[in-house]
């Protein structure tokens, strides 16, 4: 398995159709032209397991993040990437848990960074996470998480908007 440095990603057009490929490390990479997956691990009390990114991450080190997230590699479907990322980051086989797709988003119709599919995993167990990706984590309600981000706690760029779009009731 290759590292992030040699990940090949599909380039997509405004309709999320594959039009080419690019290496993740290519300086010409524009995130709105690639696909990503994100997932939230949610417990029976409605809390989300929110990890803190490893300090060695090049993007958003030490920041709060989605439970699972990553780029869809070239040739993968969104679901295949979700399965791979859940296994790599949380040591979870998704079919051992209850899970569902939550939403799909376009960067051309939202302020989100990329084309993305968002999933939800259900479990009351705290995951055994990959320490290369994650330095720790905690269970938070969506409201508490949004309050911490609003108060200035470092978070990955799309986290607050994803929580609002997927978990906050319309006001």
Curated annotation (Swiss-Prot):
Superkingdom per UniProt: Bacteria
UniProt cofactor(s): Mg(2+)
Keyword field: Hydrolase, Magnesium, Metal-binding, Nucleotide-binding
Protein EC: 3.6.1.-
PROSITE patterns associated with the record: NUDIX, NUDIX_BOX
Biophysicochemical property: pH dependence: Optimum pH is 9.0-9.5.
GO molecular function: hydrolase activity; magnesium ion binding; nucleotide binding
GO BP annotations listed: nucleotide metabolic process
Activity regulation info: Inhibited by zinc, calcium or copper ions.
Residues the record lists as binding Mg(2+): 85, 89
SUPFAM superfamilies listed in its UniProt record: Nudix
Motif (Nudix box): 69-91
Nudix hydrolase domain span: 32-162
InterPro entries: NUDIX_hydrolase-like_dom_sf (IPR015797), NUDIX_hydrolase_CS (IPR020084), NUDIX_hydrolase_dom (IPR000086)
Gene3D superfamilies assigned: Nucleoside Triphosphate Pyrophosphohydrolase
The protein's assembly and partners: Monomer.
Protein family: Belongs to the Nudix hydrolase family.
Function (record text): Hydrolase that converts various nucleotide triphosphates (NTPs) to the corresponding nucleotide monophosphates and diphosphate, and nucleotide diphosphates to nucleotide monophosphates and inorganic phosphate. Has a marked preference for cytosine ribonucleoside 5'-diphosphate (CDP) and cytosine ribonucleoside 5'-triphosphate (CTP). Has lower activity towards the deoxyribose nucleotides dCDP and dCTP, and towards dGDP, TDP and UDP.
Protein name per the record: Nudix hydrolase DR_0079
Organism of derivation: Deinococcus radiodurans (strain ATCC 13939 / DSM 20539 / JCM 16871 / CCUG 27074 / LMG 4051 / NBRC 15346 / NCIMB 9279 / VKM B-1422 / R1)
Lineage: Bacteria, Thermotogati, Deinococcota, Deinococci, Deinococcales
